A protein has these predicted regions:
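A beta-strand/beta-hairpin structural motif
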Residues: 257-287, 294-299
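Extracellular beta-strand-rich recognition modules
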Residues: 226, 230, 290-297
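Surface beta-strand/loop "capping" patches
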Residues: 198-252
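Catalytic cores of secreted or luminal carbohydrate-active enzymes
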Residues: 163-214
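Catalytic-core regions of glycoside hydrolase
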Residues: 43-185, 289-291
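An active-site-proximal structural segment forming one wall of the substrate-binding cleft
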Residues: 1-45, 70-82
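Residues at beta-strand starts and edge strands
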Residues: 40, 222-224, 240-242, 273-277, ...
Length: 299
């Protein structure tokens, strides 16, 4: 359905019209001044081009791929100009919702600029056509967070394309850090409790610590050792340095020291929980009030 029609009831913007771009620039400038670099903003979509902001015009203008890419680059550059310090993501539909492949010039253009991938089409169709770009995600997820969104839950229930196992598999294969739902939350939760719990156990990073040993007490001048076996049971890395920290208290319950083990960086630990090694940190408490000395750190 859709496409150009002389008597059509809807209209598409001319996405490189000077007036449109001037107004868009004004908006992005103001939004960037307020939100760029804000630690509470996880990501921002490059969502000002294409139907539903998804970077395609398949049901509207039906632009040729070359023209679609040219226009997409304009909007990508505008967002990057005003959000240089905030994670940006762009829909995979910008290169075609079902276009096969794992390497496209436009997606390389995004990757080189630190812009990551999102896929809003999970479970629009059933079976093998539930999603198309898990291979494309391989170029992004090791360094950048991947975002997924499933089709309207009610629509998939009517069409028969909903499948909880397939949704979980998409999280696994895309190594997704975020998954947004597309329906009334209370309904989707009520009807998919186990699926949502399974997704939450794998989505993004999930630090697990099956073993942690430490002495019951320490005294100044006597070395002590903390041993930890920890790993990442999620499908993606943290994308930032993440270290364990230990708080030591005195006999009155006051904080005597907070120790960060910078030799154990979860950002560098493999995802999927396939490896949960043990590391040991050996330290010595010096005289009261002078802190702690690290004698040695080894794995």
């Amino acid at each position: 359905p859709g496409g150009p029609a002389p008597d059509g009831a809807a209209a598409d913007p001319v996405f490189d019209d000077p007036v449109y771009l001037a107004k868009l620039r004004n908006f992005l400038r103001a939004a960037g001044a307020r939100y760029n670099g804000n630690p509470d903003v996880a990501f921002i979509d490059v969502g000002t081009f294409g139907l539903w902001g998804e970077g395609h015009t398949l049901m509207t203008q039906r632009l040729k791929p070359e023209e679609n890419e040219r226009l997409a680059r304009i909007h990508i550059d505008l967002h990057k100009e005003y959000f240089p310090d905030t994670q940006l993501v762009i829909s995979d539909d910008v290169i075609g919702p079902e276009t096969p492949g794992d390497d496209f010039p436009l997606m390389r253009y995004c990757r080189e600029r630190g812009i990551s991938l999102r896929d809003d089409s999970i479970l629009v169709q059933p079976g093998e056509k539930a999603y198309f770009h898990a291979e494309l995600a391989r170029a992004f997820w090791p360094e950048l967070p991947v975002v997924l969104e499933h089709e309207h839950y009610g629509n998939t229930r009517k069409s028969g394309s909903w499948n909880g196992e397939t949704l979980l598999r998409s999280v696994e294969e895309y190594h997704a850090s975020y998954l947004s739902i597309h329906w009334w939350p209370e309904i989707e939760w009520r009807e998919n409790v186990e699926t949502i719990r399974a997704v939450n156990r794998r989505l993004g990073y999930r630090i697990v610590i099956p073993e942690l040993t430490f002495p019951a007490g320490i005294v100044p001048g006597v070395p002590f050792e903390i041993s930890i076996r920890a790993g990442n049971a999620g499908v993606a890395p943290p994308y930032r340095d993440l270290f364990p920290a230990y708080t030591l208290t005195d006999e009155r319950g006051g904080i005597a020291g907070v120790l960060g083990d910078e030799t154990l960086n979860f950002r560098r630990r493999p995802a999927d929980g396939t490896e949960i090694p043990k590391s040991r940190c050996r330290m010595t408490a010096v005289t009261p009030g002078t802190g702690f000395r690290s004698d040695r750190l080894k794995y």
